[in-house]
Amino acid sequence: MNHSEQPFDVKEALLFSQRMAQLSKALWKSIEKDWQQWIKPYNLNINEHHILWIAYQLKGASISEIAKFGVMHVSTAFNFSKKLEERGFLKFSKKLNDKRNTYIELTPKGEETFHKLLEDYDPARTGIVKGAQPLHDIYGKFPEILEMMCIIRNIYGEDFMEIFEKSFSNIEKDFLNERGRVTKKSEELEDSADAAEKAAKANQIV
């Protein structure tokens, strides 16, 4: 088989891709186990929890957006969203100007469950945190994995990374670290934070 000339060494590319594949597989095995143990008390699977996570961030996402940002097939996104609707965690809707797409949104029960899941998170039971602990001890923070994020951006696009970043900034904004637990901010604190953010933006404009 003829290969067109590449701007890099083919053997180097092979070793890189296989190194990434095998490390990702090993890492995913640990992450999958941690994730399943975390959500097991709520009788959720990983796809269902991921859908709740995305629905919380997007506040009215279409099924196609859930599939795109959840890295799953559209039928998978729809079927698991339907199960979450049956359990009262999601509500489905159509838009008057867009009858083709189905949109989902968290119900009060779904939002409460999402909050409880974050509050129940225990880093002591998380293999990925334990594995990164020595790096945190040395540098005072967890790895930022910037090179990995650059690769993902080049594969999945800027929109994907914008939602990815937004999801974590929303958690930063809406939740507190309180006595070793992640807890939802009170409405008073949220209003105060929103006011401060608006004031900061106004000052930047001036």
From Swiss-Prot:
Residues 186-206 are annotated as: Disordered. SMART domains: HTH_MARR. One of its GO terms (molecular function) is DNA binding. Pfam families: MarR (PF01047). Residues 63-86 bind DNA. Keywords: DNA-binding, Repressor, Sporulation, Transcription, Transcription regulation. Residues 13-157 form the HTH marR-type domain. Negative regulator of protease production and sporulation. Homodimer. PANTHER family: DNA-BINDING TRANSCRIPTIONAL REPRESSOR SCOC, TRANSCRIPTIONAL REGULATOR, MARR FAMILY. This is HTH-type transcriptional regulator Hpr.
